[in-house]
From Swiss-Prot:
Its EC number is 6.3.1.2. Its cofactor is Mg(2+). It comes from Aquifex aeolicus (strain VF5). Its main location: cytoplasm. Residues 16-100 form the GS beta-grasp domain. Mg(2+) 2 binds at residues 135, 212, 220. One of its GO terms (molecular function) is metal ion binding. It catalyses: L-glutamate + NH4(+) + ATP = L-glutamine + ADP + phosphate + H(+). One of its GO terms (cellular component) is membrane. InterPro entries: Gln_synt_N, Gln_synt_N_sf, Gln_synth/guanido_kin_cat_dom, Gln_synth_cat_dom, Gln_synth_I. Coiled coil: none annotated. Catalyzes the ATP-dependent biosynthesis of glutamine from glutamate and ammonia. This is Glutamine synthetase. The lineage of its organism: Bacteria, Pseudomonadati, Aquificota, Aquificia, Aquificales. Residues 108-469 form the GS catalytic domain.
Length: 469
């Protein structure tokens, strides 16, 4: 996204005839919130003082007796919304406490900013680069609901392998074979092209896009790496564009980790490296062309993997994806080129600038401010303490017999297991006051409340299994 000063934003509003300004920010759980004000209300003071709003209405934020909050727009994030009329300019905001004048501790964008600053304070590096590959589904119809006497969901897609008659029965993608046939089999190419064109117009550099393994419109758009905060901001915009383009065409996009029970889920493989003074610290002469720094970073991520999964895979649904047989990692191992490992070292290029690791277990239901910050903090801990990642695992982990799997640590099998791991292993996140104990406890309590909400609802499959016993 282009970078602006407050004065340049005000000039842009006048030049483009902007009528409304939309102020956006994330709640703790990764959902964009917004408030809209007429453009004539925007002045230089707006950037200095901010705009007041009710923080008690945001899930996980203030109580009603301390509800006043301030949203201060970041001019560097300004863009003209291509979907909204009349012409509307959007800015992402930082959240402040109006009483103390300080940043709000539950503003997850602040956590991301603190993580970037802490990296510099350690002297290890000055920039952490992230390149997420956020996968999604596009459906033609979606229905779901729960009530006192029912619980159900139903999705459909013209690409769905279960639709064998109409429409386009001659161009169906066979089950789990969506990677990646050309049109007319790939019916979503034009939609993705439109998404990419809008992303490019708004400053998000796209490297490629393609259909994914699952049928029913699963796709992936890969965006070029960027620094932690910039990339997290871009990921919110990425998801917004995907959803809005789908909606424009009467379709429905979702980033849920597991939608279809017998098909691949949607992940967010995250490429990651640390740089200093323009030099890639992950390039070296060790295994797969990595440096010792990179291996220690891997050691930290593997050691703290169960804990950071509470942020990178933050929903009950996330763990329906992390099962064998659907190209998602379940074991905390690392390897070159090996997509069955939790961490893969891509080998596409021998250029030292391209050397990175790919953390394969996250999904796009995560809040990227928290997910990226947690990955970075685990890596820093690994580097500072020279945590040995052990030997690489170059075998296909999915095909190993049980006796060979015993020595390989597992990712959590459920959100409850991930929260338990976070509860027992969060000291590394507190360094530099990046995460606070108060925020971590809020996260654990909120997520356990989600688990309880689901725990008391019988699953429709239970009726098939147990109705007439």
């Amino acid at each position: 996204m282009p970078k602006y000063t407050p004065e340049e934003v005000l000039d842009l509003i006048q030049k483009e005839g902007v009528q409304y300004v939309d102020l956006r920010f994330s709640d703790p759980f990764g959902q964009w919130q917004h408030l809209t004000i007429p453009a004539y209300e925007i002045s230089k003071e707006t950037f200095e003082v901010g705009r007041g709003f009710d923080g008690s209405s945001i899930r996980g934020w203030q109580s009603i007796n301390e509800s006043d909050m301030l949203a201060k727009p970041d001019p560097n994030t300004a863009f003209i919304d291509p979907f909204i009329e009349p012409k509307t300019l959007v800015m992402i905001c930082d959240i402040y406490d109006p009483v103390t004048g300080e940043r709000y501790g539950r503003d997850t964008r602040y956590i991301a900013q603190k993580a970037e600053q802490y990296l510099k304070q350690t002297g290890i590096g000055d920039t952490a680069y992230f390149g997420p590959e956020a996968e999604f589904f596009i459906f033609d119809s979606v229905e779901f609901g729960t009530a006192a006497n029912y619980a159900f969901w139903r999705v459909d897609s013209e690409e769905g392998w279960w639709n064998r008659e109409v429409p386009s029965s001659g161009y169906k993608i066979p089950h789990k074979r969506g990677y990646f046939p050309a049109p007319p089999v790939d019916k979503m190419m034009q939609l993705r092209n439109e998404m990419v064109s809008i992303m490019s117009d708004l400053g998000i550099i796209v490297e490629l896009h393609h259909h994914e393994v699952a049928t029913a419109g699963q796709g992936e758009i890969d965006i070029r790496y960027d620094s932690l905060l910039n990339q997290a901001d871009k990921l919110f915009l990425y998801k917004y564009i995907v959803r809005m383009v789908a909606a424009k065409h009467g379709k429905y996009a979702t980033f849920m980790a597991k939608v279809l029970p017998n098909d691949n889920g949607s992940g967010m493989h995250t490429h990651f490296s640390i740089w200093k003074n323009g030099e890639n610290l992950f390039a070296g002469s060790e295994y797969a062309g990595l440096s010792k720094t990179a291996l220690y970073a891997i050691g930290g991520i593997l050691k703290h993997g169960p804990a950071i999964a509470a942020f990178t895979n933050p929903t009950v649904n996330s763990y329906h994806r992390l099962v064998p047989g659907y190209e998602a990692p379940v074991r905390l191992a690392y390897s070159a080129r090996n997509r069955s490992a939790a961490i893969r070292i891509p080998m596409y290029s021998q250029n030292p600038k391209a050397k990175r690791i790919e953390v394969r277990f996250p999904d796009a239901t995560s809040n990227p401010y928290l997910a990226f910050a947690a990955i970075l903090m685990a890596a820093i801990d690994g580097i500072e303490n020279e945590i040995d990642p052990g030997e690489p695992f170059d075998k296909d982990i999915y095909s190993l017999p049980p006796e060979e799997l015993e020595g390989i640590p597992q990712l959590p099998g459920s959100l409850e297991e991930a929260l338990k791991a976070l509860e027992e292993d969060y000291e590394f996140l507190l360094k530099g006051n990046v995460f606070t104990e108060e925020f971590i406890q809020l996260w654990i309590e909120s997520k356990r409340a989600e688990i309880d909400e689901l725990r008391f609802i019988p699953h429709p499959k239970e009726f098939e299994l147990y109705w007439d016993i």
